[in-house]
């Protein structure tokens, strides 16, 4: 099942840099060149911001400067305002102007005061990083044809806005007090014409500026509300200025009575994009170590561009049904909330795994987000590993950490080569080489998620499950970005590691779903799979897009798992007795305990949709914990644990986890005890998701016990003394489970499992 501002990302992923840095970061060597060397700190800025009585005007020698050629700022002609008379004469001898002309773009000498909004991101050289404060704009940057000061909020008397106090001006400069509390007068001669005209002109400018500021904020309100910490802007500077220019030239905005309605329209358009942008917040924010991928056009913006150019939409998969269903997860009725699959699809919650070393866990989590973090130097393998686990095979976890040896740096395989290596392939193969027509004739779709589709086929006279994931493409899949080779590799290796616990000697369990094979294929979606998809959609109503839009060069990863059975949620009325429920709980606890001992494993999302049950003829199942083998009565059912999207795993000094510290939607859910477990996990690890806290497994065991006691109905009633005693034991387990520290502690110490 399925996440990165970044437009998510997530989905197995990692980065080293901190997120949420305001503005774009300058690279070394990209510093702005000084236009002049200020001889005096008081004269470092243009006279438009300084008091004309304290310092003389500064002349400019640049032909593009608005004060050129060498004339004093005080002699600039006055521009007529809307509230003034059209026939009123100016103080200069320039011809009368019939319309408002655009001002030239600002130059380096124009200060960037605290009253200005933050610079547009991703706009070089007009944007500033956190280490530069002087605003430098390109000559064609101001497409609106008016002063950039119009886009600052109206100055309020009193303290300036503290939000940009540190980045507005350099610390070595001092702004006059008047400039911080009063709007600057564009021309000294205007003030000399009299109080009546000055007041009229200032009121007109303030009114115009206030209207523009409200228009700008109307579009930014929704973005800041649903973005990560309200700090990341999701549009490039050019797109933002183009949108504002369209608003200013809109004839509907010429009438003051229509401005309010226009603002409401802009806000409503932002709400339409909210669900998609939640999963892609901070996508435009580049950080060191981030994957370089082509910028993809969002579905709403892509549709608008196609309408503007007259081209029909090619792949617009965000249907009206899906948009309505994803507006609010928590407004659904109780019956719709019962299925976590539906809720998970609305989240787009397929996050990218973070990969780091054990030593770097805490520092990495503090400085990373749910984006990609890939450790450039892994720690040495844990000494005395045999004391923890005796491995009978070679682990592939080392592939997640790039080699640092100098003489093999240029020979380091790419992530694509690593994935092909795990598939035992040299490159992608056709669908037909992996899935023959004979296999697909009896194909059936059995599940889905944001990641893709799950089908069941018959292979070697046994049912198997195929998890098909599209990778490396530009098309959105179910509203989310496709994974890359780097992002899919950890999922392959984690599934492989947990599957191979069934072949270990020192810590062994068969409780995790078995991975049979992995393939990377290329081509169109097979027609027989589309037929199975259509049947599923007819009978159960799929929440996914029909996978018929892929091109011939599309890549897919096919994970072939053993058939795990039916999830516990759908079996809530089909279990024979409470003794069967006890066996299920025992098997889950044993599997988690073995994974804790071998891999420092936390599942972190073990709801009853991720517990599969299938029939077995075995009377007992064996597991080995720290070299000691024990048995569990099956009562005819075998448990398989699935879905490691949020899981945490550690092997050979490498930690793989999913940082969900910024996923507020996950921690604000209501209507099921499951959502309380997420909040309890965050309380346990203090939102540091790279650390190992096996108590989180205990929390999920408490959740599953609650479901067994309160939500499940058994075919055989608890009438016999033996059944009544088992139920009492389960109730005692439910009351006492939270006092244990781990699944291993529970398995070894609790009376239910003795």
Swiss-Prot record:
Of the GO CC terms on this record, one is:
centrosome
Positions with a binding annotation for ATP = 446-454, 467, 562-567, 605-610, 643-645
Q: Which reaction does it catalyse?
A: L-seryl-[protein] + ATP = O-phospho-L-seryl-[protein] + ADP + H(+); L-threonyl-[protein] + ATP = O-phospho-L-threonyl-[protein] + ADP + H(+)
* Keyword Cytoplasm included in the entry's annotation: yes
- Pinpoint the Protein kinase domain residues: 440-754
Catalytic center at which residues?
A: 127, 605
Query: Which portions of this protein are annotated as coiled-coil regions?
Result: none
Task: Give the subcellular location.
Answer: Nucleus; Chromosome; Cytoplasm, Cytoskeleton, Spindle
Question: For this chain's UniProt record, which GO biological process terms are given?
Answer: chromosome organization involved in meiotic cell cycle; gene expression; homologous chromosome segregation; intracellular signal transduction; mitotic sister chromatid cohesion; mitotic spindle assembly checkpoint signaling; negative regulation of G1/S transition of mitotic cell cycle; protein localization to chromosome, centromeric region
User: What residues bear Phosphothreonine in this entry?
Assistant: 379
Q: Which InterPro entries match?
A: GSG2_C, Kinase-like_dom_sf, Prot_kinase_dom, Protein_kinase_ATP_BS
- Disordered, as annotated region: 1-113, 245-327
Spell out the Basic residues composition-biased ranges.
Answer: 294-304, 314-325
Domain of life of the source:
Eukaryota
Chief localization class? nucleus
Keyword list, A-Z: ATP-binding, Cell cycle, Chromatin regulator, Chromosome, Cytoplasm, Cytoskeleton, Kinase, Magnesium, Nucleotide-binding, Nucleus, Phosphoprotein, Serine/threonine-protein kinase, Transferase
Tell me the Pfam families matching this sequence: Haspin_kinase
Q: Which residues carry this modification: Phosphoserine?
A: 55
Write out the biased-composition intervals (Polar residues).
45-55
* Modifications made to the protein after synthesis: Autophosphorylated on both serine and threonine residues. Strongly phosphorylated during mitosis but this does not appear to significantly affect its intrinsic kinase activity. Phosphorylation by AURKB is required for full activity toward histone H3 at 'Ser-3' in mitosis.
So what EC number does this one have?
2.7.11.1
The record's comment on protein family reads: Belongs to the protein kinase superfamily. Ser/Thr protein kinase family. Haspin subfamily.
- The protein here is known as Serine/threonine-protein kinase haspin
Which species? Mus musculus (Mouse)
**Lineage of origin:** Eukaryota, Metazoa, Chordata, Craniata, Vertebrata
């Amino acid at each position: 099942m399925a996440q990165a501002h970044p437009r998510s990302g997530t989905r197995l992923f990692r980065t080293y840099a901190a997120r949420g840095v305001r503005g774009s970061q300058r690279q070394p060597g990209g510093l702005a060149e000084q236009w002049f060397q200020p001889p005096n700190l008081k004269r470092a800025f243009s006279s438009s911001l300084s008091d004309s009585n304290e310092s003389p005007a500064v002349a400019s020698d640049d032909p593009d400067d608005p004060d050129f050629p060498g004339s004093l700022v005080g002699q600039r002609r006055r521009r007529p305002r809307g509230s003034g008379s059209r026939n009123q004469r100016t103080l200069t001898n320039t011809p009368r102007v019939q319309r408002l002309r655009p001002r030239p773009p600002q130059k380096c000498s124009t200060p960037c005061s605290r009253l200005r909004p933050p610079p547009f991101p991703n706009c070089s050289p007009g944007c500033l990083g956190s280490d530069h404060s002087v605003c430098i704009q390109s000559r064609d940057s101001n497409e609106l044809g008016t002063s950039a000061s119009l886009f600052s909020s109206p100055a309020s008397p009193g303290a300036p806005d503290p939000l940009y106090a540190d980045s507005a001006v350099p610390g070595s400069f001092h702004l006059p007090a008047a400039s911080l509390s009063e709007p600057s007068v564009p021309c000294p001669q205007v003030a000399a014409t009299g109080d009546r005209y000055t007041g009229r002109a200032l009121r007109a400018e303030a009114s115009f500026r206030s209207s523009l500021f409200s228009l700008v904020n109307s579009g930014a309100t929704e973005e800041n509300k649903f973005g990560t910490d309200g700090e990341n802007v999701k549009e490039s500077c050019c797109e933002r200025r183009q949108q504002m220019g369209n608003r200013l030239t809109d004839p509907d905005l010429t009438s003051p009575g229509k401005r309010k309605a226009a603002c409401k329209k802009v806000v409503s358009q932002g709400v339409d994009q909210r669900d998609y942008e939640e999963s892609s917040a901070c996508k435009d924010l580049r950080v060191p170590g981030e994957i370089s991928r082509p910028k993809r056009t969002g579905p709403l913006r892509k549709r608008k561009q196609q309408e503007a150019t007259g081209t029909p939409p090619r792949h617009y998969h965000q249907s009206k049904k899906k948009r309505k269903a994803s507006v609010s997860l928590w407004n659904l009725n109780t019956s719709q909330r019962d299925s976590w699959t539906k809720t998970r699809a609305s989240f787009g919650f397929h996050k990218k795994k973070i990969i780091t070393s054990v030593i770097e866990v805490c520092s990495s989590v503090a400085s990373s987000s749910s984006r990609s973090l890939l450790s450039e130097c892994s720690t040495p393998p844990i000494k005395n590993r045999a004391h923890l686990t005796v491995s009978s095979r070679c682990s592939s976890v080392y592939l997640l950490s790039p080699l640092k040896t100098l003489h093999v740096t240029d020979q380091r395989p790419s992530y694509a080569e690593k994935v092909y290596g795990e598939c035992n392939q040299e490159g992608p193969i056709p669908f037909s080489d992996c899935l023959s027509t004979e296999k697909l004739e009896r194909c059936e779709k059995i599940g889905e998620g944001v990641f893709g589709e799950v089908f069941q086929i018959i292979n070697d006279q046994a049912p198997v499950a195929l998890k098909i994931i599209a990778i490396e493409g530009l098309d959105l899949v179910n509203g989310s970005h496709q994974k890359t080779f780097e992002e899919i590799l950890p999922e392959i290796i984690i599934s492989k590691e947990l599957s191979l616990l069934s072949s270990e000697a020192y810590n062994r369990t068969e409780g995790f779903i078995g991975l049979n094979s992995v393939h990377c294929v290329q081509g169109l979606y097979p027609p027989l799979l589309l037929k199975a998809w259509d049947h599923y959609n007819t009978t159960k109503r799929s929440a996914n897009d029909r996978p018929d839009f892929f091109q011939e060069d599309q890549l897919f990863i096919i994970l072939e798992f053993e058939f795990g059975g039916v999830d516990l949620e759908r079996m809530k009325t089909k279990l024979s007795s409470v003794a069967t429920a006890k066996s299920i709980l025992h098997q889950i606890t044993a599997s988690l305990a073995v994974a804790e001992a071998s891999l420092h494993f936390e599942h972190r999302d073990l709801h009853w949709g991720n517990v599969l049950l299938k029939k077995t003829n075995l009377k007992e199942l064996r597991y080995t914990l720290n070299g000691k083998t024990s048995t569990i009565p099956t009562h005819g059912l075998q448990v398989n644990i699935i879905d490691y999207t949020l899981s945490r795993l550690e092997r050979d000094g490498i930690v793989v986890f999913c940082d969900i510290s910024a996923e507020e939607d996950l921690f604000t859910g209501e209507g099921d005890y499951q959502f309380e477990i997420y909040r309890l996990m965050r309380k346990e690890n203090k939102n540091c998701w790279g650390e190992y806290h096996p108590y989180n497994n205990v929390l999920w065991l408490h959740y599953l016990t609650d479901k067994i006691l309160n939500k499940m109905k058994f075919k055989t009633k608890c009438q016999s003394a033996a059944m009544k005693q088992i139920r009492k034991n389960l109730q005692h387990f439910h009351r006492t489970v939270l006092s244990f520290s781990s699944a291993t502690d529970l398995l070894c110490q609790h009376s239910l499992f003795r």
